[in-house]
Amino acid sequence: MRWAWLLPLLWAGCLATDGYSLSVTGSVTVQEGLCVFVACQVQYPNSKGPVFGYWFREGANIFSGSPVATNDPQRSVLKEAQGRFYLMGKENSHNCSLDIRDAQKIDTGTYFFRLDGSVKYSFQKSMLSVLVIALTEVPNIQVTSTLVSGNSTKLLCSVPWACEQGTPPIFSWMSSALTSLGHRTTLSSELNLTPRPQDNGTNLTCQVNLPGTGVTVERTQQLSVIYAPQKMTIRVSWGDDTGTKVLQSGASLQIQEGESLSLVCMADSNPPAVLSWERPTQKPFQLSTPAELQLPRAELEDQGKYICQAQNSQGAQTASVSLSIRSLLQLLGPSCSFEGQGLHCSCSSRAWPAPSLRWRLGEGVLEGNSSNGSFTVKSSSAGQWANSSLILSMEFSSNHRLSCEAWSDNRVQRATILLVSGPKVSQAGKSETSRGTVLGAIWGAGLMALLAVCLCLIFFTVKVLRKKSALKVAATKGNHLAKNPASTINSASITSSNIALGYPIQGHLNEPGSQTQKEQPPLATVPDTQKDEPELHYASLSFQGPMPPKPQNTEAMKSVYTEIKIHKC
C-alpha cells in the first residue's frame, strides 16, 4: 500500500520537469565595489495564479531561509544582500536576471533560482557561480588643454568602469597648485587649475572612494607646466679651486690675472631654454657647451659684464655677472740720484685695481702732491700705473730710512733706502767737510759692496806679503851693492786717494709698460774716515845706472843700478 501512493507522486515530479527550463550563465566574475548583471530566462507552465521568483544561496532553506533577491513583496531578503541584489523580472515574468551592485567579497558563492506561488520549482541543476575579486581599476585624469603658467585649465577625473546604479563614488583632489572644484556628475569630477612655475613637476592626485564597499582607489599624475625662463643663476669656478660657487644675477666676481675661469649659466624654464653668452669685448671665447663660457687665462681686457640670455617659447630672461681682474702688485724702484742741491728719487707701481704710492721718511709719511722747504712730492696715476717723485733738500745728522710704499686692494709692498751722513756736494761740486751730504744705499747693494771690499783687501794683503818676502831675499843677496856710491835712488813717490763706493740703484719705468731701464749715477760716495791709519801698498824695485868696468876677476859680484818706484794698489 505504501508504494501505491508514492507512485502518483513520482509521476507528478516527472510531469513537473516538462515545461521547466532555466537559461543562465554558469559563472560570473566581478571586481569588488562594481556591478554585474547576470542575464537569465526561465520557462514554466502557464498558471492562473501569481508566480514569484527567488534567488537563494546554495544550501539555503527555501522555506525558512531568506533569499538574496526576490520579487515577492511579502518575503524579506538576506540582510547583507539588501539593496545590492536585485531580481529584474516582475511577478509572473519569465525574466530571472540578477543584478548585483557594490559587489563584496562575501558575495562569492553559488546561487540557484526558484519559482514559488501557483507554480513551484527549484532549478538546482542550473546553478550560478559568482566570484568577487579585488578592484584593479583606477580613475582616469584628463587635462583639457596645455598647462601654461597663469592660465586656468580644466581637469577631469572619471570612473567610467563604475556603475551608475551603485552607490555614487566620492571624489577627492590633492594638489599643491591653486585649484577649485568645477562641475560634478555621478562618475566624474571637474577641477579648475591655475598652474604656476613652481607647480611644474608636482603631483596631482584624484582619489575615488566607493562607499558601498569602502574601497578607495586613486591616480596620480605629474603636472607639466609651460613657463618662461626664471630664477637664472651663474655657477662659477676659477683657478685651482675644484669647488664651485653659485652667483645670483648682478653679482660681482674678482679673480687673479692669469687664472682660469668657468661660467655656467643656469635657468629654470619649461621647455628648457636656449642659452647664449655675451661678453664686453670682441675677443673670441671658448664655449664647452652653450651654457658654459671658459677663459683659460684671464687678462685685464677680459674685465666687464658678462650676460647670459635664456629664451624659450614663453619668453626670455638675462642674467649677468661683473668680472674684475686683479693683477699682481708690482713695485718698481725707488731709484735715486743727486741732481743740483738735492736728492731726487722716483718710484712706480703697477697693479689692478690701480695702486697708490706714498713715501715714508723715518716716521713721517709723504704722499699726494705736497711741498715745503725740505721736500717736494709729486704723484700721478694712469690706468694700472701710479708714479711718484720725491726731491729731498734737507740734511740729516744721523741715519734715516726712506721707503716707497705701494698698496692696492689690501695688498702692500715696500722698498727701503738707508740715508747716511756724509760730505755735502757744493754748487761747485767740491767736497766740504764742514757739512754732511746725504748718502743713499739699498741694503742689498751695500752688503754686496762690503763683501767685495773685504775680498779685495784679503787679496791685496796676500799679494803684499809675497812682495815683502821677495824684497827681503833680494836685499840679502845684494847687500854689498848698497855700499856702492854709484848706486842711488833717483826718485821715490807715494800717492793716496779716497776709496769711493758707489751704490747704483735699479731705475724704474718712467712710463707704463716700459721695460727699459736707464743707468743711474752712483747714489753716494763713502769718504775716507780713517786718514791716520797706514794704507797697504806694494812696490816694485829696479836699479838703473852706468855699468861698471868688467872686473878681471870673473868671480866678482855684478852690480845693478835701478830706481825704486812705489805704486799704490
Curated annotation (Swiss-Prot):
Subcellular location as annotated: Membrane
Residue ranges of domain Ig-like V-type in the record: 18-116
UniProt motif ITIM motif: location: 536-541
Pfam family for this entry, one: I-set
GO biological process, one term: cell adhesion
Topology in the lipid bilayer: Single-pass type I membrane protein
Signal peptide positions on this chain: 1-16
Glycosylation sites: 95, 151, 200, 203, 369, 372, 387
Keywords: Cell adhesion, Disulfide bond, Glycoprotein, Immunoglobulin domain, Lectin, Membrane, Repeat, Signal, Transmembrane, Transmembrane helix
Claim: Membrane is one of the keywords in the record: yes
Any GO MF annotation of the entry: sialic acid binding
Region (Disordered): 508-556
Residue sites binding N-acetylneuraminate per the record: 114, 120, 122
Disulfide bond sites: 35-163, 40-96, 157-206, 265-308
Residue intervals annotated with topology Cytoplasmic: 461-569
Extracellular side, ranges: 17-439
InterPro entries: Ig-like_dom, Ig-like_dom_sf, Ig-like_fold, Ig_I-set, Ig_sub, Ig_sub2, Ig_V-set, SIGLEC
GO cellular component: lysosome; membrane
Placement of sequence motif SLAM-like motif: 559-564
Expression tissues: Predominantly expressed by immature monocytic/myeloid lineage cells in bone marrow. Also found at lower levels in mature neutrophils and monocytes.
TM helices/strands, residue ranges: 440-460
Domain comment, as recorded: Contains 1 copy of a cytoplasmic motif that is referred to as the immunoreceptor tyrosine-based inhibitor motif (ITIM). This motif is involved in modulation of cellular responses. The phosphorylated ITIM motif can bind the SH2 domain of several SH2-containing phosphatases.
Assigned protein family: Belongs to the immunoglobulin superfamily. SIGLEC (sialic acid binding Ig-like lectin) family.
Listed name of the protein: Sialic acid-binding Ig-like lectin 5
Protein source organism: Mus musculus (Mouse)
Lineage: Eukaryota, Metazoa, Chordata, Craniata, Vertebrata
